C-alpha cells in the first residue's frame, strides 16, 4: 500500500508540505499500519524519504528502500540559496523568498531543519542513487550510507526523478533485488 504526501498524486490540491505538518501525519499512518499488519517495510522517494526518516526513526520498520533520497535537507536548502544568490541574512530578514525557478526558500523551514537533524535512523536501508542527481551530491549520499550502514547502489545514467524507460527498468530491477 502507498500514500501520497501533500502536493503529490491524489493530494495535489493540498499545500502544506512542511516537515512539522507531514511528519505527524506519517506517524499516524504508521500507527494505523502497526495495528493492522505485522511486518512493515518502507519505500520512499526524494523528500518523502527525508520526511520518513524524521517520522520513523526509532520504530520497528523492517526495511527501507529509498530512491533519490534527500538525506541532508540543510545542505539542499543552502545549495538552493546559493543557486538563487540568497544570503542567510536576506532569508532571515524576509522570512520567505521565491526563487526564479519557482521554489520558495523559507527561514522558518531552514531553522526547523537545523533543529531536527537526521540522527536516529537505524532501520536497515537500501538506497538507489542516480549518478546525475542534482539535488543530493554523491559525497552526501555516500557519507549518509556509511554513517547509517545503508546499502548504496548508484545508477550512473539516472536523474533525481527516475522517469525514462531505462531508468524505470533499472529501478524495478533494483526493487526486486531488495525485497
Question: What does each model-identified segment do?
Answer:
Residues 1-12:
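Conserved alpha/beta-hydrolase
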Residues 2-3, 44, 66:
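Conserved SAM-binding loop
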Residues 4, 46, 131:
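Nucleotide-sugar donor-binding loop of glycosyltransferases
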Residues 9-10, 49-50, 72, 161:
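Short secondary-structure capping/turn micro-motifs that flank functional sites
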Residues 16-35:
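Alpha/beta-hydrolase active-site loop
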Residues 39, 59-143, 147-154, 158-178:
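The alpha/beta-hydrolase serine catalytic core
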Residues 43-52:
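Gly/Ala-rich beta-loop-alpha elbow adjacent to hydrolase catalytic centers
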Residues 55-56:
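Aromatic pocket-lining residues of Rossmann-like dinucleotide-binding sites
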Amino acid at each position: 500500500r502507498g500514500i501520497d504526501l501533500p502536493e503529490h498524486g491524489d493530494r495535489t490540491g493540498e499545500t502544506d508540505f512542511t516537515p512539522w505538518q507531514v511528519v505527524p501525519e506519517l506517524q499516524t499512518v504508521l500507527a494505523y499500519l502497526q495495528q493492522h499488519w505485522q511486518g512493515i517495510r518502507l519505500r520512499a522517494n526524494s523528500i518523502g524519504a527525508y520526511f520518513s526518516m524524521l517520522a520513523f526513526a526509532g520504530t520497528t520498520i523492517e526495511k527501507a528502500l529509498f530512491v533519490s533520497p534527500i538525506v541532508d535537507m540543510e545542505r539542499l536548502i543552502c545549495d538552493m540559496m546559493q543557486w538563487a544568490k540568497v544570503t542567510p541574512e536576506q532569508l532571515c530578514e524576509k522570512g520567505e523568498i521565491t526563487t526564479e525557478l519557482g521554489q520558495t526558500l523559507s527561514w522558518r523551514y531552514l531553522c526547523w531543519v537545523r533543529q531536527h537533524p537526521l540522527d536516529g535512523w537505524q532501520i536497515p536501508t537500501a538506497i538507489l542513487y542516480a549518478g546525475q542527481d542534482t539535488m543530493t551530491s554523491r559525497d552526501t549520499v555516500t557519507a549518509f550510507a556509511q554513517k547509517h550502514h545503508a546499502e548504496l547502489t548508484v545508477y550512473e545514467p539516472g536523474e533525481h526523478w527516475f522517469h525514462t524507460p531505462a531508468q524505470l527498468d533499472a529501478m524495478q530491477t533494483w526493487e526486486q533485488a531488495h525485497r
